[in-house]
Amino acid sequence: MITIKKGLDLPIAGTPSQVINDGKSITKVALLGEEYVGMRPTMHARVGDEVKKGQVLFADKKNPGVVFTSPASGKVIEVNRGAKRVLQSVVIEVAGNEQITFNSYEANQLVSLDRETVKTQLVESGAWTALRTRPFSKVPAVDSETQAIFVTAMDTNPLAAEPELIINEQSDAFVAGLDLLSTLTNGKVYVCKKGTSLPRSAQSNVEEHVFDGPHPAGLAGTHMHYLYPVNAQNVAWSINYQDVIAFGKLFLTGEIYSERVVSLAGPVVNNPRLVRTQIGASLEELTDSELMPGEVRVISGSVLTGTEATGPHAFLGRYHQQVSVLREGRDKELFGWAMPGKNKFSVTRSFLGHLFKGQLFNMTTTTNGSDRSMVPIGNYERVMPLDMEPTLLLRDLCAGDIDSAQALGALELDEEDVALCTFVCPGKYEYGQLLRECLDTIEKEG
C-alpha cells in the first residue's frame, strides 16, 4: 500500500448517496472537440446528416487514423465552432437504435487476440480515444506503444462515485477490459485502487496497487509518480475504470457501450445521487428539476477541474464521471475577511469553521477576493504529495520559464494534478491553464 499524507479532501456539502438510479431520458448528446488536446478535426458529418451509433463524426488531422464516433444514433443538429473556428461540439438529436457493429468474442478468447486485432477494433469504434498519454494528456498515436498502462479504479475527487460499486456491477466486462489492455503493452497494466476487493485479471502483467490518503491519491498522475515516473522518453497511458468496462463490452458484445454512471451532486442539488446516463448527455436535460432555485453553475466533472456546462458545452464530457453543481457566488460580504467565519472553510484555518470537525460547507463559485500576486505561505506544499518543489514550479509557470518548469517535473503533470494548488492559492492563479500553455510550448519546440 502507498499512503499519501499530503492533499485535501474538500469538505463540500451535497455528497451523493452511493446507490445507482436511472437518469432522465436524454434527447440530445454531443462530442466536445475541445476535450481532445491538440486535435484538429476533419469533419465526416454535417448538420442534417442521419448517423448511426458508432459512425465516424470527425477524424484528427494531426493524429492520422484516430477517429471520433457518435455515442448515439440520430440526426446531427449542430456543429458549434468558436474563435478561429475551433470545434466546440457536434450535437446529435437522439432517435432510433441503429448502430454499427463489430466483431464479438467469448471471454476466454480475448487473451489470445493479437495486438493489431485489438488495436484495430478499438480505433475503428472510436474507443481508442478513451486512452490518454502522459506527458501531454493526448490521445495516443495509432502506431505508438507504451511500457505502462494505468487504470484509475479509484476516485478521490470531491462528490465522486465509489468505483467499486460500478465495477462490481460489470465485473465480467471489467476483467475483459483488463485482458484487452494487457495485450496492448509489453510492460505492465497497473490497476490502482483503494483497499476494497475488485475483480481481477489472471494475466501476469496486470498488477493491483493500493493507494490510500486524501485527494489527489486517486489521480493517474499520482499513481504514475510512485510506480512509473514519466518524462519525454518514458510515456505511459491512462484510462478510467468505466472506459475499461466499455472496452470489455465492445469485444464481448460487438457493440459500442456508451452508458455512464455519474454522480449528480453538490450543495444545490435536491437529491444528490448516482445516475445512469450516457457519454455526451445533455446536462440541461439531466439536471432538469434536480436543482434548488437561484443562479447556479452546472459543471461537467469535478468542482476542482471540471468545465462549465453552458451553451455549446452543456454536455457530459468524454472523460468525466460526475456532474457537480454550485451556487454562483455573486453576493459580497462587508468586511468578510474580518468575520469569525463559522460557516467558511479555510486551508490556513483563518476562520472558525476549522474548529468543527466533520462540518460540510455550502461552497459557491466565489473566489473570495480579486487577483493578486502569488504569495508562497506553504499552502502548495500542504496539498502536493508528489516529490517536487511546487512553489518553485508554479512560480516558473507564472513567469513562463519553460526550461526550469520542465526540469522541475512539469512533464509529469496534467491540469488535474495542480487543481488543488489553484484552490489554495491566495493569488487566485489558474495553474492548470498555465501548465497547459507550458506543455504546449514544450511539445511544439521538441
Curated annotation (Swiss-Prot):
GO molecular function: oxidoreductase activity, acting on NAD(P)H, quinone or similar compound as acceptor
Enzyme class at the top of the EC tree: translocase
Keywords: Ion transport, NAD, Sodium, Sodium transport, Translocase, Transport, Ubiquinone
BP-aspect Gene Ontology terms: sodium ion transport
Entry EC number(s): 7.2.1.1
Catalytically driven reaction(s): a ubiquinone + n Na(+)(in) + NADH + H(+) = a ubiquinol + n Na(+)(out) + NAD(+)
TM annotation in the entry: none
Pfam families in the cross-refs: NQRA_2nd, NQRA_N, NQRA_SLBB
InterPro entries in the cross-refs: NqrA, NQRA_2nd, NqrA_C_domain, NQRA_N
Function description: NQR complex catalyzes the reduction of ubiquinone-1 to ubiquinol by two successive reactions, coupled with the transport of Na(+) ions from the cytoplasm to the periplasm. NqrA to NqrE are probably involved in the second step, the conversion of ubisemiquinone to ubiquinol.
Similarity comment text for this entry: Belongs to the NqrA family.
Subunit structure: Composed of six subunits; NqrA, NqrB, NqrC, NqrD, NqrE and NqrF.
Record-given protein name: Na(+)-translocating NADH-quinone reductase subunit A
